[in-house]
Amino acid sequence: MNIKERLHAARKEYIEKYKVSPNIIFVSQSLYSELSSMVGGLNFYEAAPKYLWNAHVIMVLTPNYIKFAEHSDVKKAIKLFNIDNSRDSYKIEKTKATIGSVSAGKHIPSQIINLEPIEFSREEIEIYAMQT
C-alpha cells in the first residue's frame, strides 16, 4: 500500500470512528519523502505550518507511522502531560453530542455519546508542542 492509500485508509478509519474530520496528521520521518513527492515538495523545516486535507501535518520520529487526530484532543493530552510527565502515553476520552429534535410528533432528546478514547504518545505531545 503506497502513502496515498495509507493516508486515505487512516483518514477514513478516523472519520468512521469519531464522526468528524481530523485536523492533525502525525506522520513519520521515514514516510516524509513519499509524502513530499505526493504533494509537490512539502518541506517540514520551513517556518510555516504544512497542511494536507486542511489538517496540520506534524512529523514524528516513530518509523512508518500515520495517525490522524484533532487539536483539541492533543491539547487535552498536553494538560495531562503538564500535570504528570512521567507516563509514556496519555488517553483522552472522546464524546459526541447529538442535537435533539421533534420528528412526527416524537421528541428525540439530545444526548452525549461516548466514543472510543484516543491515546497520544509522549513523543506526539512533545513534538506537537514544539511545532505549534
Describe the residue ranges of each PLM region.
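Residue-level detector of functional hotspots within protein domains
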Residues: 10-11, 43
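Extended oligomerization regions of viral-like shell subunits
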Residues: 16-101, 107-132
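Exposed extracellular interaction/assembly regions and N-terminal maturation sites
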Residues: 1-5, 11
